[in-house]
Amino acid sequence: MKLTLEPAPRCLHEYVSQLLEDWQPECLSCEYSHGGSSRPSLHDLFDLELENSRSPSPLLCDWCAEADSESTISTETDVGFTLNTPPVSPLPSYSTSPASIPEDMLLCLEEMPTFDDGDEVRSATTSFESRREKNFDPHVGSFFGCLRCAYYQEQGENSICGLCYLKALAEGKIF
């Protein structure tokens, strides 16, 4: 493998100008002068004429001009388009007061001793506190977590919810 080193350019401006000429895309015509006396201004480089915006630019190749004309046609069709939306109706007010909701309905399920008899998920012998005292091992199937996790673990699944997983991870029970 042979490496060739080019000497450092004497004038950075001339070097960059030469690179721009070498790498110039074929569809753009650059009128940048090499002389250091008259540098183009930003207005000269990015001069936009709004009067002739519908005609394709003479600086673009055929494919670019066609794509540009398609984009202007699609925006011209949207100019007169307005969307009529129906007015938003106000939200209905509910006559429930905070006093009508019992306080035990606002408690977290983890703090409740048991469900009602009709909705019993776990028995009195398998209380939530006794499950929490056992060490968590997902491969053995010991119970851990909230009531939802306990229900599925009683069904034979070795799963816990995301919140209980994070709690167990924070307590160091999952490595």
Swiss-Prot record:
One of its GO terms (cellular component) is host cell nucleus. Its main location: host cell. A motif (LXCXE motif, interaction with host RB1) lies at residues 106-110. It comes from the Viruses. Residues 40-48 are annotated as: Interaction with RB1 in competition with E2F1. One of its GO terms (molecular function) is zinc ion binding. It is found in: Host nucleus. Coiled coil: none annotated. Keywords: Activator, Early protein, G1/S host cell cycle checkpoint dysregulation by virus, Host nucleus, Host-virus interaction, Inhibition of host innate immune response by virus, Inhibition of host interferon signaling pathway by virus, Inhibition of host STAT1 by virus, Interferon antiviral system evasion, Metal-binding, Modulation of host cell cycle by virus, Transcription, Transcription regulation, Viral immunoevasion, Zinc, Zinc-finger. A zinc finger (unnamed) spans 146-164. GO terms for biological process: regulation of DNA-templated transcription; symbiont-mediated perturbation of host cell cycle G1/S transition checkpoint; symbiont-mediated suppression of host innate immune response; symbiont-mediated suppression of host JAK-STAT cascade via inhibition of STAT1 activity; symbiont-mediated suppression of host type I interferon-mediated signaling pathway. Belongs to the adenoviridae E1A protein family. Plays a role in viral genome replication by driving entry of quiescent cells into the cell cycle. Stimulation of progression from G1 to S phase allows the virus to efficiently use the cellular DNA replicating machinery to achieve viral genome replication. E1A protein has both transforming and trans-activating activities. Induces the disassembly of the E2F1 transcription factor from RB1 by direct competition for the same binding site on RB1, with subsequent transcriptional activation of E2F1-regulated S-phase genes and of the E2 region of the adenoviral genome. Interacts with host UBE2I; this interaction interferes with polySUMOylation. Interacts with host RB1; this interaction induces the aberrant dissociation of RB1-E2F1 complex thereby disrupting the activity of RB1 and activating E2F1-regulated genes. Interacts with host ATF7; the interaction enhances ATF7-mediated viral transactivation activity which requires the zinc binding domains of both proteins. This is Early E1A protein. It comes from Canine adenovirus serotype 1 (strain Glaxo).
